[in-house]
Regions:
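A membrane-topology feature that recognizes alpha-helical transmembrane segments
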Residues: 1-299
């Protein structure tokens, strides 16, 4: 396991912060408060309004539309159909990613996280396009597709923000989790597959608990923000199978170790300890765990 974000303090609807990177956007410090730091009380008072989350409804609507198109295309068994829908999904994913950028900026500003990463939407848009393309090709017309698409679109932004700031808004984690669970429940009903739904929830809860225990033992590695995000990401993998869940535990940590080694050897910068955002590795590792053959790591 590798070091990652460490949540130094969480208030309701506050920001998940790094122990080594507490600096937030400049605020007016009170007596005894260091400049640039936001108190837990201040973060706790900043609660997003329901209107802040409206763009997520758009993400869900587009995800469902892509699923309907995929269900129709894969049902016709025409070779060109799935590829056309996957290409459409990629374009839709990129558009959705750009469309939710203002919401991401609002959530970051609300809890005093630097909003600068949200001004760079190209990489999240390209990453979301790739994930949506792959999700359509893998899931086809299965009803789990909207859940995967929605979780992917929102998680990519969480990873992007975490990469630059070593934190991301707790309201964003809650939005990803709630959206994923609701759409997952829809998939259980539509596909009449309670076994996959139960496996997804159990897998998410088990890995969440494992990460939490490890974070407590190591005093914050991985960070509690990553622990929270791991639940819905592992649940997404759990829908596929237990061997994929094992990959979802292994891959993020392997990728993170590789990332740290590359940074130390070729990065040309000195870091204090190991300071990096773990969410990007969680997202990439989750996608690979779904896409790769089950049990590939046993070969």
């Amino acid at each position: 396991m590798v070091e990652s974000n460490v949540e130094s303090g969480n208030a309701a609807d506050g920001a998940s912060t790094s122990l080594f990177a507490e600096e937030a956007e400049p605020t007016t410090p009170g007596r005894g408060q260091r400049p640039g730091l936001v108190s837990v009380a201040d973060a706790g008072r900043r609660k997003p309004t329901l209107s802040t989350y409206l763009p997520i409804l758009g993400v869900i609507a587009v995800s469902v539309a892509v699923w309907i198109a995929a269900r129709w295309a894969f049902g016709r068994h025409e070779q060109a159909g799935p590829w056309s829908v996957a290409a459409f999904a990629a374009l839709a994913g990129a558009a959705v990613s750009v469309a939710v950028r203002p919401m991401m900026a609002s959530l970051c500003a609300l809890v005093q996280i630097p909003v600068r990463p949200t001004s760079r939407p190209i990489v999240p848009a390209v990453a979301t396009a790739g994930l949506w393309f792959g999700a359509v090709m893998f899931a086809g017309g299965d009803a789990i597709l909207p859940a995967w698409l929605t979780v992917a679109a929102l998680s990519v932004w969480a990873a992007w923000i975490d990469h630059f700031t070593l934190r991301f808004p707790l309201p964003l984690i809650r939005a990803v989790t709630v959206s994923g669970l609701l759409l997952g429940a829809m998939a259980v009903v539509v596909d009449q597959d309670p076994a996959s739904g139960l496996r997804a929830v159990v897998a998410g809860a088990a890995i969440f608990a494992s990460y939490l225990v490890f974070a407590i033992i190591t005093r914050g590695h991985p960070g509690l923000a990553d622990v929270r995000l791991s639940f819905i990401l592992t649940a997404a993998v759990g829908w596929v199978g237990w061997m994929n869940v094992a990959s979802a535990v292994l891959l993020p940590n392997v990728l993170a170790v590789i990332g740290v080694v590359v940074t130390k050897v070729f990065g040309g910068r000195t870091v204090r300890g190991v300071e990096f955002g773990f969410a990007p590795y969680l997202v990439v590792g989750t996608a690979l765990a779904i896409a790769l053959p089950a049990g590939w790591w046993m070969l």
